[in-house]
C-alpha cells in the first residue's frame, strides 16, 4: 500500500440550470478533451428533447434513467490456487452511479440518431422506461454475477 496520504474527494458543483450534482457529473462523464461547454450543450439539448417527446419533467426522466441503470452486483476476478474465479461483489454507491452514467453514455453513442443530443435523449427515455442499451449492459452484469454465485465465498 502506498504511504501517501489519502486524496480528498473533490466536490462537484450543481449545474446552473437544474441545480443537480448528478447532472454535472454526467456532463463530466460525457465531456471529451475538456470541452465542457460542448457537453453542456449536448445534455441540455437532450433534456429539451425529452420534455418535447414525453411531456414529463426532463430532470425526473434523467434521474429515473440513471437509477434504472445502476448495477447492484458485479463480478471481480480473484486468483485462488492457480485458477481465476469471477467473484460476485456488491457495488459501492459511488461506483454504481459512475457505472450507470458510463453505460448510458456508451449506449447513447452506439445509437443511430443523427446528433448526440437526440441519441442521448432517446437512450435516457428508453432507460427510464426499462429498456435500452444501458439496461441491457446492467442485466448482462447481473447475469454474470448470478452465474458465478457459487464463488461468492471467495469474498474480497
Swiss-Prot record:
Biological processes per GO annotation: ribosomal small subunit assembly; translation
Signal peptide from the UniProt entry: none
Gene Ontology molecular functions: mRNA binding; rRNA binding; structural constituent of ribosome; tRNA binding
InterPro entries: Ribosomal_uS7, Ribosomal_uS7_bac/org-type, Ribosomal_uS7_CS, Ribosomal_uS7_dom, Ribosomal_uS7_dom_sf
Pfam name, any one: Ribosomal_S7
A GO CC term attached to the entry: ribosome
Keywords annotated in UniProt: Ribonucleoprotein, Ribosomal protein, RNA-binding, rRNA-binding, tRNA-binding
Family annotation (CDD domains): uS7_Bacteria (cd14869)
Function as written in the Swiss-Prot or TrEMBL entry: One of the primary rRNA binding proteins, it binds directly to 16S rRNA where it nucleates assembly of the head domain of the 30S subunit. Is located at the subunit interface close to the decoding center, probably blocks exit of the E-site tRNA.
Assembly: Part of the 30S ribosomal subunit. Contacts proteins S9 and S11.
Family indicated by similarity: Belongs to the universal ribosomal protein uS7 family.
Protein name, entry field: Small ribosomal subunit protein uS7
Amino acid at each position: 500500500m502506498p504511504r501517501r496520504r489519502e486524496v480528498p474527494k473533490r466536490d462537484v458543483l450543481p449545474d446552473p440550470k437544474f441545480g443537480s450534482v448528478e447532472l454535472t457529473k454526467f456532463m463530466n462523464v460525457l465531456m471529451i478533451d475538456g470541452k465542457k461547454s460542448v457537453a453542456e450543450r449536448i445534455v441540455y439539448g437532450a433534456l429539451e428533447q425529452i420534455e418535447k417527446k414525453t411531456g414529463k419533467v426532463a430532470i425526473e426522466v434523467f434521474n429515473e434513467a440513471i437509477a434504472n441503470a445502476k448495477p447492484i452486483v458485479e463480478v471481480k476476478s480473484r486468483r485462488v490456487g492457480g485458477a481465476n474465479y469471477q467473484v460476485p461483489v456488491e457495488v459501492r454507491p459511488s461506483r454504481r452511479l459512475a457505472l450507470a452514467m458510463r453505460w448510458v453514455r456508451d449506449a447513447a453513442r452506439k445509437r443511430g440518431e443523427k446528433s448526440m443530443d437526440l441519441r442521448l435523449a432517446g437512450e435516457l427515455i428508453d432507460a427510464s422506461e426499462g429498456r435500452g442499451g444501458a439496461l441491457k449492459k446492467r442485466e448482462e452484469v447481473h447475469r454474470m454475477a448470478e452465474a458465478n454465485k457459487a464463488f461468492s465465498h471467495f469474498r474480497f
